[in-house]
Amino acid sequence: MQNAHSPASPNAMASPARVGSRPVGREAPRALPPRLRCRPITADDIAAILELLCEGFPRLPRQHWHAALDLLRRRDIPDGTSRYGYLVESDEKAVGVLLAITSAFDRNGRATIRSNSSSWYVRPEFRAFAGLMLSGWLRSPADTYLNVFPAEHTFAIIEQRGFVRFTNGMAMALPAAVWRGGGARVLAVDRLAEARFPVTAEDRRLLLDHWAAGCVAFWCEDRVGGRPFVFRRRWLKSRLPCAQLIYCHDIRDLTRFARAVGRHLWRHGLPVVLVAGNARVRGIPGIFINNKYPMYCRGEPPRIGDLAYTEAGLFGF
């Protein structure tokens, strides 16, 4: 969850001003507290939310937020969940925003709902009420709540709300340097009909959805079977292009198809692969940086290599 600023403790609430029957001395009358409430964002709020996002994250262009909100508008979402996320309003004017990406999955034959919070911003004078949106989001129906890009100053806040780390750092791998495993081939999403092995409807949808959002998505297969892969283009220190792993069925698939995947990404100008996890990627040259971009969850944690339908893949943060 990107955070524009450090909010006060989410549990802190401003005490309402006490209104007495008569003034004490010459004290100025105390202003009444603003009428605050948290509620789900609706289509009617989009213009106001867009302004808040541009205000809170000025380094991102306005078009980025247009695209993100339009993507949320077009997505299928589980019943009873918010399409866009939550806002805080004061006197019916939006003063805070928290976007949420909520998705239904079939994982290992079991239906599950996963929700990822993103882009948390509250105007400075209302920052003591930032936790209202967090509470609203955590009341929404989900089996897993994700915060994949928390700002460091929010670690303690989300830990107080029951979040725990499911990754502690970032692995950097060079799959193109692997020489074994020849014979595998890569099929882009527009060539899935050529696959020798069945591509399930869920895998096909996942690949197409992330490709449409700007990811490098493809199917890789060898003589034994095929697997989907999704990566997102990133930049290390604004100079070195790299590919962040967004999705694979099993992290061992990255090792199994390392040579084919690495060469395909190399042709896209992406020699380095980033994997959020807790150790190096086994069987691929690289390093692991501990305590670098840790990710948090509440509820059932996703497995390593599954950031599907999160801000990492859909928004490109």
Model feature map: region roles:
Residues 4-6, 12:
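Short hydrophobic alpha-helical segments enriched in small aliphatic residues
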Residues 16-29:
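Short acidic N-proximal helix/loop "leader" segments that mark the beginning
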Residues 21, 49, 57-85, 89-92, ...:
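Amide-forming acyltransferase catalytic core, primarily the GNAT-like/NAT-type
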Residues 35-49:
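A short beta-loop-alpha structural element at the N-terminal edge
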Residues 86, 96-98, 115, 120:
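Conserved GNAT-family N-acetyltransferase fold
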Residues 92, 100-107:
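Acetyl-CoA-dependent GNAT
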Residues 108-171, 239-294:
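Acyl-donor binding region in acyl/amide transferases
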Residues 291-317:
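C-terminal functional modules
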